């Protein structure tokens, strides 16, 4: 979160385009924070993308012949079918670039990212800066009404800076006690 993942993906895609390569960029429908279809970084850099519901729709939108580069942003939001699809593309000689969060707001492995990371030839883990202490931030802090979220809150809740901020290990807080149910005290 705020480490420049989308910005780096955009930079790499633009380099491939400058090199004359055929490129396709995909993102999940779920990510509509800044634009319905473009991949957009927090600082406004953007590149055209195709927004898809799942890995099956991504596969259906791959042209024949295949592009030389396929890029996927926010991969943590995709279904498990994305993993074998990207492996298949790589096996066919397509350069695959993926951006996504490795951990959710609870600091737990996020969706399909652990498997994608394990199977990648190259992994570059970017960090932000913790706004609390200035240390490298490797975690995503979810804030609800300015307070740290509870562990039992839903994992997927797409937002921008008003809902999330980067945190270091020391400053990352997740409330582990379950929320009291209404009427539980009474």
For the regions a language model picked out, list residue spans one by one.
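Conserved ATPase-coupling elements of RecA-like P-loop NTPase cores
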Residues: 74-89, 105-110, 179
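Structural recognition of the conserved hydrophobic beta-strand(s) that form the central parallel beta-sheet
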Residues: 71, 95-102
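Anion (oxyanion) recognition and catalysis
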Residues: 17, 90-91
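Conserved P-loop
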Residues: 1-64, 104-115, 125-128, 149-151, ...
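Short acidic/histidine-rich motifs immediately flanking catalytic phosphotransfer sites
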Residues: 64-69, 75
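Short basic (Lys/Arg) and small-residue
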Residues: 120
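Short recognition patches in nucleic-acid-associated and regulatory proteins
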Residues: 129-156
């Amino acid at each position: 979160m705020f480490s420049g993942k989308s910005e780096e993906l955009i930079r790499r895609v633009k380099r491939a385009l400058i090199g004359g390569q055929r490129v396709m960029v995909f993102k999940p429908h779920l990510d509509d924070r800044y634009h319905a279809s473009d991949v957009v970084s927090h600082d406004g850099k953007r590149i055209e993308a195709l927004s898809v519901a799942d890995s099956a729709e991504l596969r259906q939108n791959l042209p024949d012949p295949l592009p030389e580069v396929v890029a996927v942003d926010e991969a943590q939001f995709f279904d498990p079918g994305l993993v074998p699809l990207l492996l298949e593309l790589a096996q066919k000689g397509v350069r695959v670039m993926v951006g996504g969060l490795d951990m959710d707001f609870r600091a737990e492995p996020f969706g399909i990212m652990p498997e994608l990371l394990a199977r990648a030839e190259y992994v570059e883990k970017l960090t932000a800066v913790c706004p609390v202490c200035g240390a490298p931030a490797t975690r995503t802090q979810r804030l609800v009404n300015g307070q740290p979220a509870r562990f039992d809150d839903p994992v997927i809740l797409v937002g921008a800076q008003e809902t999330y901020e980067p945190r270091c290990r020391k400053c990352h807080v997740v409330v582990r006690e379950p929320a009291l149910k209404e009427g539980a005290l009474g």
